[in-house]
Amino acid sequence: MSLFLDTARIEVKAGKGGDGAVAFRREKYVPDGGPAGGDGGKGGSVIFKVDEGMSTLMDFRYNRIFRGKPGEKGMNKGMHGRGAEDLIVHVPQGTTVKDNETGDVLVDLIEKDQEFVVAKGGRGGRGNIRFATPRNPAPEVAENGEPGEDKILLLELRVLADVGLVGFPSVGKSTLLSVVSNARPKIGAYHFTTITPNIGMVQVGYGDSFVMADMPGLIEGAHSGAGLGIQFLRHIERTRVLLHILDMSELEGRDPYEDYKTINDELESYNLRLMERPQLIVANKMDMPEAAERLAEFKEKLAADLEADQEMPEIFEVSGLTKTGLQGLLARTSELLAQTPEFLLYDEDALGDEVAYYGFEDEEKPFKVSRDDDGGWRLSGEKIEKLFIMTNFDHDESVMKFARQMRAFGVDETLRSMGAKDGDYVRIQKFEFEFVD
């Protein structure tokens, strides 16, 4: 039996940009040659791509870290480093990608061959050619490559199906799917034979078709995680029409009406919008003795429980075993699909902003100041830390440039206003220097 995995937590780390070079021309007949250090190449991004051949997230169970390659360093004679190739990670169709820390949805991958940059590679550092000015025609300044984005992502897989079969275990969902579609699910005379969603293509009439999914049996408390409830309910979210399968036989000793109410309560508790989907009641196993009598009792209870303005739900009498009553059910299902639009899982406007953005967000202030336990001062913040990482401290001019940029950010003024004294230690990441007032 193949395992099914519909959630995974992974780390994606894009490649660092290549360092820029400090170099000078050393050519015959060219005295006092100018700067010749090239730029570093860009780091490789991590890109998710939909693969229709994948049906689970099992590949991410043991392979949880994906790293892009770094760009090459800049070279002499103004030659730029080669950019790294992007890392393509294949995911199944229907995968939702979320930021693990915030829970924000980054993208919903539902289109064939759809791609999305989940971690952008760092840009290459500039070589000293870029820093030449009339006042300083031969600078010994170059940048280190920009670090690539590093994220923890949560992947959730929801099967892509138009119609979902819901109901308690052993009510005949798998049998029904097997006789109306090309699916061949495992069928057994015991509960939870189906532990993964089965999908089949259903042909109706001339040319009409739709995808039907047999959802594993639900139990009371599924919305709060009882059994494997949340995993199963997640897959129903993409469907447009629900077929609620009820067992009208006496084999399991169940009450069809209580089953009907319990399953709908679970759907509503998990996600209110699931109850907005058209739902057909499928009275299954009508070939069994006493089935007609039990169906009549079900209809009486259902009618008595309806509000004054509620219409009686549509009920179809079928037998998956003898294949009776199925054509009418499928025809009505096809009609409802034609009338029912897709239900959006996420707000398109909010999702659009996330999809369009690949870079680093600007903070209101480029740095923050805090105190260490020993009384030293610590600078932090994405902007100033990135500036620090991209500074090449092997060259004095680069160090002086970094100091000027710190002053331009207002670091000196802020430290002074917070009480920093001459000789106090100031730290940024693992680097330490003395404050000079």
UniProtKB/Swiss-Prot annotation:
Q: List the disulfide bonds.
A: none
UniProt keyword list: Cytoplasm, GTP-binding, Hydrolase, Magnesium, Metal-binding, Nucleotide-binding
Checking Pfam families in the record gives: DUF1967, GTP1_OBG, MMR_HSR1
Molecular function via GO: GTP binding; GTPase activity; magnesium ion binding
Q: What is this protein called?
A: GTPase Obg
Record keyword Flavoprotein present: no
Q: What does this protein do?
A: An essential GTPase which binds GTP, GDP and possibly (p)ppGpp with moderate affinity, with high nucleotide exchange rates and a fairly low GTP hydrolysis rate. Plays a role in control of the cell cycle, stress response, ribosome biogenesis and in those bacteria that undergo differentiation, in morphogenesis control.
Cofactor(s) required for function per UniProt: Mg(2+)
Which residues are noted in the entry as GTP-binding? 167-174, 192-196, 214-217, 284-287, 319-321
According to the record, the segments passing through the membrane are none
Question: Could you tell me where this protein is found in the cell?
Answer: Cytoplasm
- Obg domain sequence ranges: 2-160
Q: EC annotation?
A: 3.6.5.-
Family under the similarity heading: Belongs to the TRAFAC class OBG-HflX-like GTPase superfamily. OBG GTPase family.
Q: Which GO terms describe its cellular component?
A: cytoplasm
The organism is Lactococcus lactis subsp. cremoris (strain MG1363)
- Could you tell me which residue ranges the OCT domain spans? 359-437
Q: How does it assemble?
A: Monomer.
What domain of life does the UniProt record list for this protein's source? Bacteria
